Amino acid sequence: MRVTPRMWIGFVVFVGYCATIVLITKLVGVPYPEIGKSAEATFKGAVLPIGVGALLLVITATALGWWRPALFERRRSPRRWPIVAPVIMVVVALVNLVSTDWSQFDAAFLLSLVGLGVFVGFSEEMMSRGLVLTAFRSRLREGWAWLLSSLLFGLMHLLNVALGAPFSSTIAQVAIAFGSGTAFYVLRRVTGSLIAAMVLHGLWDVSVFAVGFAPKGTVFATLVAPVIAALSLAVVYWVIKGTNENPISHASTSAHAAA
């Protein structure tokens, strides 16, 4: 690592990422409620700003030298069964995709949705459960690092109000995001890598936007989101228990071993 992880760096990454997304979205002038309703609105209102955010995160991770701790656990959770929460999330996402009337999408719209999934999956995970979690682990015990990084991930969705989203529905979105963020954290701990969480996050968002735009009928699967959130919160203790992923202590141990 070029730069020793510090907690304040996590807050700087969080604020910088959020500010970038809001600024670019405001500049392109696409209200949040329009995202997911057309190829142009989805590209300008989501793919473009989040893509720029992804580029900045790549630059930041490279400058800090944090790619390894951001993407990989030193030791994954010995308890595998909590993966049931993200597995249910995968099933719900697939049901959403099957429940979507894909005839309503042209090629440009499909490409925009794919771009949305790729950039959201990478950017939001790299920011919250990558760089921010790495920074928080340098100072906090694992339980607090999970809690604070997940809270910030949930609160980040309040920015949608500034972009035109209704406040009442956004509050619910914040709560669900905290729970789904916990599911992504559980997946990281169980698999030992952030990559699976990136893939699931992208798949989830694409499925929600797709079925929201062109449902074949009543969408029941998305209603399971609060259950997934609650289940994730119920099992997260078991992937936190006994965990020490402090990047500073591990770096010091490696240095002493090499000497």
Ranges and model annotations:
Residues 6-62, 83, 87, 111-112, ...:
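Alpha-helical transmembrane segments in multi-pass membrane proteins
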Residues 13, 146-153, 196-206:
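Central hydrophobic cores of alpha-helical transmembrane segments
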Residues 22, 170-226:
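Functionally important transmembrane alpha-helices
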Residues 32-46, 58-126, 133-134, 138:
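Juxtamembrane helix-loop-helix connectors linking adjacent transmembrane helices
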Residues 70, 202-259:
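C-terminal membrane module of polytopic membrane proteins
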Residues 89, 117, 121, 142-158:
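Small-polar-interrupted transmembrane alpha-helices in polytopic inner-membrane proteins
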Residues 97-107, 162-168, 213-220:
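Membrane-interface helix caps and helix-loop-helix hairpins in membrane proteins
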